């Protein structure tokens, strides 16, 4: 049975998926799901949303957690959150608890947050500061570089401390962003990181702090959260607060861009050039992009009135009129950097229909709450926008769960960013599913 959306009746896409699972030559359910998922990806209709199982099936979710979230570089936090030796942050990536900690000479380490004794989590708080990493269960004690220092009582004469250090996780950072990858061989990212460093150099990311943080759980698949972010087709009807400052166009390459917008961009780019801040659009495939775009003329910050949220500007920026430096990192982050503050977003799947969205507002390290900025005022635009997006994603999920759902067409004019994301997702998943397929085939002797 074909899985192409143009052939399968909408009400039977899940049936087709189940048929492939049932007829797979392998007994392992995840291997069977792999074959069925790869087949759906090969036959999916371009410029359309994905078939229903990609948004609600636990087996597809398990596959994409393995092939994407346990493989890609994921944004997990900011270096300013672990400023000194012993500072740590934790993050949950699927079933995998991870700890990122600052060690000697400022070195940043990442480990599986799992004791090598009996598997208990070491650090249970989101953030903290410790002299050593100590398991709360039996007090096994680790150095900040992961070496096991103490293993309790009577482990036997042959017990080897050196063989029981914490299991490391790949970690890197640039422009104040922390990224981890659970893969043994993470994908190449150096070009993007170098550009991230260059574009954020004027913001002096060693001198920022988190002024506010929000964590909300959306009852929607993580891809719906990202899809919603990758277009502003919905903005006029959903985001009055955001449109006080944001211009919907993504860049001058946006097919909707008007001559007036291109003129504004040209004037702003001349201003940014004079201020010596990078602005040119940079793409790294469909996974990463950076671009500086103007806001509504006369607006300098994403606030309710367009005025700065912080009187202390970021880094060495000479004035607040810096537009919005937009940074996209798939699969789990989008960001806006303005002259006075920045807003960074992190997306982490919790289940097939549940996603954690974390928002952090950054200001200059020396900005004083109550003097230079009011965190509640700073948050208003994106608190409202994120909640509106939550409602949109959740209603999208409810509709997709219906037997009436079938993949719908994207607009190349308004939803080109969604097309890019879904294409990136599909290509990435398919290449990795195909790459591992031979090792799972049963060979008859």
From Swiss-Prot:
Membrane-spanning residues: none
Requisite cofactors: [2Fe-2S] cluster; Fe cation
Binding site for Fe cation: 234, 239
UniProt keyword terms in alphabetical order: 2Fe-2S, Iron, Iron-sulfur, Metal-binding, Monooxygenase, NAD, Oxidoreductase
Entry keyword annotation includes Repressor: no
Inhibition and activation profile: Activity is absolutely dependent on the presence of BmoB. Glycine betaine monooxygenase activity is significantly enhanced by Fe(2+) and severely inhibited by heavy-metal ions, including Co(2+), Mn(2+), Zn(2+), Cu(2+) and Ag(+). Severely inhibited by EDTA.
Catalysed reaction, written as an equation: glycine betaine + NADH + O2 + H(+) = N,N-dimethylglycine + formaldehyde + NAD(+) + H2O
EC numbers, comma separated: 1.14.13.251
Binding positions ([2Fe-2S] cluster): 115, 117, 135, 138
Alphabetized GO MF terms: 2 iron, 2 sulfur cluster binding; iron ion binding; monooxygenase activity
pH dependence: Optimum pH is 7.5.
Enzyme class (EC, first level): oxidoreductase
Temperature dependence, free-text field: Optimum temperature is 30 degrees Celsius.
Cofactor comment: Binds 1 [2Fe-2S] cluster per subunit. Binds 1 Fe cation per subunit.
Observed effect of gene inactivation: Can use glucose or dimethylglycine as the sole carbon source, but is incapable of growth on glycine betaine as the sole source of carbon.
CDD domains per record: RHO_alpha_C_GbcA-like, Rieske_RO_Alpha_N
Limits of the Rieske domain: 73-180
Pfam families in alphabetical order: Rieske, Ring_hydroxyl_A
Similarity comment: family membership: Belongs to the bacterial ring-hydroxylating dioxygenase alpha subunit family.
Assembly description: Homotrimer. The system is composed of an oxygenase subunit (BmoA) and a reductase subunit (BmoB). Maximal specific activity is obtained when the ratio of BmoA to BmoB is 5:1.
Function summary: Involved in degradation of glycine betaine. Part of a Rieske-type oxygenase system that catalyzes the conversion of glycine betaine (GB) to dimethylglycine (DMG). This subunit is the terminal oxygenase component of the system. Is specific for GB, and does not show any activity on choline, L-carnitine, stachydrine, dimethylglycine or sarcosine. Activity is strictly dependent on NADH.
Protein name listed in UniProt: Glycine betaine monooxygenase oxygenase subunit
Lineage start: Bacteria, Pseudomonadati, Pseudomonadota, Gammaproteobacteria, Oceanospirillales
